Regions:
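Active-site cores that bind ATP or allylic diphosphates and position pyrophosphate for catalysis
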Residues: 1-108, 116
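Catalytic adenosine-cofactor/nucleotide-binding cores of aminoacyl-tRNA synthetases and other
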Residues: 87-183
Length: 183
C-alpha cells in the first residue's frame, strides 16, 4: 500500500535472532541478544545512508584493527559485527569506555561545549597534558607529567581503564599542566 501511494522504502539489515558475543577490551565478554533489537535501517527513504553501513565499510577499507568508543555504542557493535560477517570481513577488536562525568557524577553531554579539547587548548592547556590526562583518567595508574608523546603512548594500556565512569577534575588537570610546563 505504501509503495502504491508513492512512498519509497527504507532498507533494513535483517538480524537473526541470536546472541552475539565478543571479548571487549575494557568490558570483558559481552553478550547481546539480537532479538532485543529491531533490524537497523541502513538506507533512508531518500536513498541516503545512515551511520552503520558506511562506518563498517570504512573500517574494512581502512583495515581498522581496533574500535574504541563509548559504552552507549554497545548495541551498535552487536549489529556491526553482523554486518562485518555478512560482508565476510575480519571483525576488529572492540573496546567500550565508560562515560566521563563531572565531580558530582553527572555526564557531559555532546551539547556542552565547555569541555571540548579546543576549549581546553584555548584555556592554555598543553596538548601533551590533555592527552596524558584523558588516556589515564579512570585508570588504575597515577597520572604523571610525561612530556614526551612516545612515553605517554608507551605507558598506555587499555586494560587499565576502569568499567566505572571517570570523574573529570579540573584541579588535577591544572596541576598536571603546571607540572608539564615546569619540565
Amino acid at each position: 500500500e505504501k509503495l502504491r501511494s508513492g512512498q519509497k522504502p527504507h532498507w533494513r539489515f535483517k538480524l537473526d535472532e541470536k546472541i552475539i558475543e565478543w571479548n571487549d577490551l575494557i568490558k570483558g565478554v559481552v553478550k547481546f541478544d539480537l532479538k532485543n533489537l529491531s533490524d537497523p535501517i541502513l538506507i533512508r527513504e531518500d536513498g541516503s545512508f545512515l551511520y552503520h553501513l558506511p562506518s563498517v565499510i570504512d573500517d574494512i577499507e581502512e583495515e581498522i584493527s581496533h574500535i574504541i568508543r563509548g559504552e552507549d555504542h554497545i548495541s551498535n557493535t552487536a549489529f556491526h559485527i553482523e554486518i562485518f560477517r555478512a560482508l565476510k570481513a575480519s571483525i576488529p577488536n572492540f573496546a567500550h569506555h565508560p562515560f566521563l562525568t563531572d565531580q558530582q557524577g553527572k555526564g557531559f553531554g555532546k551539547r556542552i561545549g565547555s569541555l571540548s579539547i579546543e576549549n581546553l587548548k584555548n584555556e592554555g592547556y598543553e596538548n601533551i597534558t590533555i592527552l596524558n590526562y584523558l588516556i589515564n583518567i579512570g585508570s588504575s595508574k597515577d597520572i604523571t607529567p610525561d612530556t614526551i608523546l612516545d612515553d605517554v603512548l608507551e605507558n598506555f594500556d587499555i586494560k587499565n581503564i576502569s568499567n566505572s565512569s571517570a570523574k573529570f577534575s579540573d584541579k588535577v588537570l591544572k596541576s598536571l599542566n603546571s607540572d608539564v610546563l615546569k619540565n
